[in-house]
Amino acid sequence: LGNQVTPKILFDFICNYAPHNNGVAKFAPYGLRKVEAGLLRDGFKREDVVVAHPDHIEKFIGPETEVVGTHEMDPLGMGPVTMTFTYGRKQMSYDEFYCRHLHQRINAAKKKTGSHAKVIAGGSGTWQYNYAPEKIGEYGLYAILEGELGGIAPEIDGHAGNFFNYLIDGQFENMDPFRKRKDFKVDIKEFKRSDKTHHGRFVNFWDRPDLDEIPEIVEPSMHGMIEVMRGCGRGCKFCDVTLRSLRYYSPEKVKKEIEVNIKKGGVDRAWIHSDDIFVYGMDPTTTKNMEPNRDALEELFTAIMSTGVKHTNPTHGTLAGAIADERLVPNLSKITNAGPNNLTGIQCGLETGSVRLIEKYADRKLAPYQPEEWHWVVKEAVKTLNENYWIPAFTLIMGLDNDETPEDGWETIRLISELEREQPDSMFTATPLTFVPIGLLEKSEFYDIGSGDDPTQLGVMYKTWQHNFKYGIKKFMTKTGQKGSVRRTAFNGLARTLGGIPLGAMEKFARRRGPKFERVIEKIKTNYW
């Protein structure tokens, strides 16, 4: 692993323990639970399907094992968060470290037991093997499952039985890549790297299952997560989810999955996954300006709370969607009992303060507003969300499509500073992430923050971290979350004690890079602190 930003002993302490029952995972990623449910629905016996805890995978690999599937969200550390905090993979991430360790143990178990199980990697991160194909052979991967456009995870839960039967029967070995099929296509890719050639079997799947073909989970998902919709409809060029067609779960379907988490997992909260909760129930083909469907959202959250959960929050939402209907967020807050002791977190893509970049890459993200109104939308949304006890966690993209100018970066810095000054009691966090080529920009290049000559990107990182430490960690982050938890108390103490260290590290980096980097840091301290 080498010299990590976060020492391994600290990472292992912070990383939540996942319980198991004789090696069977009590909780599992939601997508994996969907595949499990699809297999059971399609005729596989319960004793033949197991979602194994990764620490106990060896218990379930033997001579009779046909398939070992791994759920991989960021297997090689190329996701935006990981790329940012490993300086563009200059250090090995814990994602990559533990994924490699898992595959090493799978291969060791196969060798020990004489198993001929086919190992297949699936999940939203399998596109990364296209950039590091040497890992395919190193990990002994029989196949890699990916969507038609790589970055988007395929929806095999609607056809799980067919997929695994094809695997077991060996049909993917001789499937004609040129034959028109309605479900799967096999592509044997060749990658030339230096003096070596690597090959990989990529199984593409692009069929869109109808709602009645999508199974409901039968065992608990991690963190009480359940999805309420697929797709987004906003059309941001840098996002892969927008490539997926829109479908909405009925409130009844949502309730059934929450009840599984309550009854089998003892969970008292529901983490509602969507890629923009404010799109739920909307028909973007007829709703020209993407105004939210307030009635549908109120019905959805009323159904969620009727299950008896104490807390619920959506994973993602747009700032424009939060304010497009002035009654929406206040009404939802009443339904969910949001308040000072029951704050609602939501991740929102701020992306950039640059009006130019927003208009070029994400203009429908602002609908029903116009790109030139972007700063007003951000400020008004923070005000509205906070007044109703919602806390947005902003993500930003640094080096968007390698098209970001210094002035674009300064617009972002100024916007955050204006929010602090105009709304001194506001609650939000801001996390800058390096650009990763997915979605409609998958042919672009990764943005390498470590080798760039523009000091403004360091300034964006510096300003956002200063905000998170001064306004986030010290003012409200340590006041939320699980009360009385030893782990939470310890984490809060670490955050308050160590939270300022990255600022010093960035100042040191600026001194090492030279005067123009130092001037950016000093300008922020003088004008935007």
PLM region descriptions:
Residues 232, 254, 348, 416, ...:
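Conserved, mostly hydrophobic/aromatic
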Residues 76-81, 274-286, 351-363, 396-407, ...:
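Flexible glycine/acidic-rich beta-alpha junction loops that bind and position SAM and/or redox cofactors
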Residues 1, 459, 463-529:
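Radical SAM enzyme core and accessory elements
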